[in-house]
Regions:
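N-terminal loops that bind phosphate or other acidic moieties
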Residues: 2-64, 68-125
Length: 125
């Protein structure tokens, strides 16, 4: 099954973090970026619907958002009942690096790995 990734955020965060991924890991396939509230009059619901239309209906989707409870995350929560749709929040660079480095893993196993390793990526130096 083909896997697609949605990186969605308030402002340009998703674009910036994906730029970092490209520098470190190279270009990745099937990545869709949603940068909400960048242009006046943008409707987050419409942006998400447009993105979902670009993804094959039988594809697996892993969506990552910047903030739990934020409008971007809340709009994507409407898709939680969709088959093979996974929604993660608290998007950060180590999380996304692991998402792409271990992209061949089963989604459930991969998501468990992401959360386990994300906890060790936050440190006080």
């Amino acid at each position: 099954m083909e896997r697609h990734y949605i990186l969605a955020s308030h402002g340009m965060f998703s674009q910036g973090i994906y730029d970092s991924i490209r520098i470190i890991l190279g270009e990745k396939k099937h990545v869709h970026l949603i940068t909400a509230y960048v242009k006046d009059g943008q409707d987050i619901s419409d942006l998400i619907k447009e993105t979902m239309k670009k993804i094959p209906t039988d594809a697996e989707i892993i969506a990552c958002t910047d903030l739990f409870g934020g409008s971007v995350n809340n709009e994507l929560m409407k898709y939680i009942g969709k088959k093979h749709f996974h929604l993660l929040t608290g998007m950060n660079l180590p999380m996304l690096m692991n998402l792409f480095l271990f992209s061949d893993e089963d989604a459930d196993k991969l998501i468990r790995r992401l959360f386990t390793e994300a906890k060790t990526g936050i440190m006080y130096c």
